[in-house]
């Protein structure tokens, strides 16, 4: 096998245009740019040992990053000879002790989704994976079912039927949604499954979020926000995964990426059928909490919109009944989610972030952050932000 002599990095087995892999590729490119490398993406196709050797001879890359999500081919580390190789979402048992692997912490995802869905005090839980039995989906479904079991809650799983037609899948999904008990909280292993549930609920005659609540994973805006009911999603930093995979070519270290925060949308915005004004309040909070929105101001605006009195005490009580937590807690969650996004995705000074989260001063935000996450903002950034 030829020794690496070129100035490029190969990203192997990617699906062009896939929103998750676009983000991973961006992370690989960010790291490569710091090292002065070019990045060559190799689209997914049937490949054998000869194909891999031809790629290595042609490019003589400084390293290879192998995509493992939804893979069709096996790329064992020994296939690459003296060329450094790392993996992203590849089966851990196939790389253990031989090459670094960047994985997703499915238990942490399950915890985040369970907490979000539990806020609405559901009567039951359900889970759905990707329509195809990808390993990442099966692991995520299992993690959520185990999380429910630890809480003493049953979890209704949508069964996967490999190879079924789209028409059959949609009909079966609609029937499953129709059969769910009232006030069921549904977790989808990925955004595509979450969007499918959002569509299927309409044909099943079920209303999200008044009858069912829904949370998915990945937080791809073009998928979540285009669903009939926009879908709340656990945010994963795929760009950071790509960065870590490229970085691990030199460090040789495994890495695990957990969720940054939950992007809340209408699919978890309360469930009181006779309380549309509570849903309006949630929308205002999620849009304006980081602008310094106060509860008293919100109550005044709702009073004007309803055209009749809304007392602060009545608002607090009705909001908690519908959402399972107070309006102040909703505002705090939105502000902390914004802080996490700024810490992970920008180079903004930690001491300046409070100005963009609606919190009066750095010390107040730092205290709130430590209470929620058990660590300082600086430490959280060191663990979760892409460097460079």
Name every feature range the model reports, one short phrase each.
Residues 263, 337, 378:
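Nucleotide phosphate-binding site architecture
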Residues 1-65, 70-301, 312, 316, ...:
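Bacterial carbohydrate/catabolite-sensing allosteric modules
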Residues 296-330, 354-379:
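Basic/polar phosphate-binding segments, predominantly the helix-turn-helix DNA-binding elements
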């Amino acid at each position: 096998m030829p020794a690496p002599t070129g100035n490029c990095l190969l990203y192997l087995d990617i699906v062009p245009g896939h929103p998750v892999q676009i983000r991973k590729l961006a992370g690989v490119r960010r790291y490569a740019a710091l090292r002065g490398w070019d990045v060559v993406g190799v689209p997914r196709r049937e490949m054998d040992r000869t194909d891999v050797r031809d790629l290595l001879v042609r490019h003589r890359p400084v390293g290879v990053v192998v995509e493992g999500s939804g893979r069709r081919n096996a790329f064992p580390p020994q296939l690459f000879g003296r060329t450094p190789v790392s993996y992203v979402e590849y089966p851990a048992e196939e790389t253990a002790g031989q090459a670094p692997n960047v994985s997703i912490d499915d238990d942490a995802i399950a915890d985040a989704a369970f907490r979000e869905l539990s806020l609405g005090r559901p009567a039951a839980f359900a889970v759905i994976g990707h329509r195809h039995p990808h390993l990442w989906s099966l692991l995520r479904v299992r993690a959520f079912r185990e999380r429910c079991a630890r809480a003493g809650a049953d979890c209704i799983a949508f069964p996967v039927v490999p190879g079924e037609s789209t028409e059959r899948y949609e009909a079966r999904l609609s029937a499953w949604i129709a059969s769910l008990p009232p006030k069921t909280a549904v977790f989808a292993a990925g955004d595509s499954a979450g969007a499918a549930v959002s569509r299927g609920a309409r044909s099943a005659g079920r209303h999200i979020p008044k009858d069912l609540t829904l949370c998915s994973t990945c937080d791809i805006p073009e998928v979540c926000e285009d669903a009939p009911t926009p879908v709340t999603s656990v945010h994963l930093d795929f760009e950071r995964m790509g960065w870590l995979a490229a970085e691990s070519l030199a460090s040789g270290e495994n890495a695990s990426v957990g969720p940054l925060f939950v992007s809340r949308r209408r699919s978890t915005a309360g469930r009181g059928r006779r309380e549309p004004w509570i849903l309006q309040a949630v929308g205002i909070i999620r849009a304006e909490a980081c602008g310094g929105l106060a509860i008293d101001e919100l109550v005044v605006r709702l009073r004007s919109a309803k055209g009749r009195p809304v007392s602060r005490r009545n608002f607090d009580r009705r909001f908690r009944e519908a959402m399972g937590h107070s309006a102040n807690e909703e505002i705090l969650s939105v502000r902390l989610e914004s802080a996490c996004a700024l810490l992970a995705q920008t180079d903004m000074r930690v001491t300046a972030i409070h100005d963009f989260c609606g919190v009066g001063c750095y010390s107040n935000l730092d205290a709130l952050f430590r209470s929620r996450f058990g660590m300082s903002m600086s430490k959280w950034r060191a663990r979760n932000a892409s460097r460079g």
